[in-house]
Amino acid sequence: VSRAKIGTQEVNALAAADALMALAGHRRQQVWEASAIKPAPALLKSVPTRERPLFLPDTPEGENILFDYKATGLTLRRHPLALLRERLATRGLLSSEQLNALPDGQDVSGCGIVTLRQQPQTAKGTIFVTIEDETGPVNVIVWKSLRETQRAEVLHARLLAVHGTWQRSEENGTAKGYGAVRNLVARRLEDLTPLLGRLGTSSRDFH
């Protein structure tokens, strides 16, 4: 790091993003050692330090995922909903994988992090929302009437539970599961964002 002449601010940002693992180990250790870096006067740069190193315990997985999103907006670790799956299952909320195995017309409930909101000009007030969990995305259709009664959930929820009807149609001439159109048509929405704790996520919104 010193050879590359990287500034203190950049070193701290790299440590927060868990990018210095090869130099300092796990993230908590990286952040600790990065915070200890202070510019030294030219005369003292060659003077060795005699401080005994302090070794910190590793960060729990959930906290690491939280810091990943805070530092970079994404994570290469497990999806946040993998950590919440048991709690979501007790609420009767199915995963994307489970939904995709269901037949057309079934009443279902699913949940995911909102990654996209679209409101095309030709949709007459309908909003298309994409939610995502650890097994994949789910396309959600929110009709204008529901949007008007649950506007806060539609526009502001980061973790959204959707209760509605599973819509699935197979294209002619395609193998089952291929070329299928799958949507969850919302009947009721539930904002479960508090379950994410301090996790910062954002969606791409298009109008």
Q: How would you describe each model-predicted region?
A:
Residues V1-A101, P120, T165-Q167, N172-H207:
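Sliding clamp-binding short linear motifs
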Residues T72, G112, I131, A157, ...:
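Hydrophobic, well-ordered secondary-structure elements that form the walls
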Residues L99, G105-Q106, T149-V154:
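Short, surface-exposed secondary-structure edge patches
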Residues Q106, Q121-T126, E153, G177-Y178:
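Short glycine/proline-enriched turns and hinge-like loops at secondary-structure junctions
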Residues D107-Q121:
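Structural detector for short beta-strands of small beta-barrel domains
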Residues V108-G110, I127, L160:
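Hydrophobic core residues within well-ordered beta-strands of beta-rich domains
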Residues P120-S145:
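OB-fold (S1/OB) nucleic-acid-binding surfaces
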Residues L146-H163:
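Short nucleic-acid-contacting surface segments enriched for D/E, G, S/T with interspersed K/R
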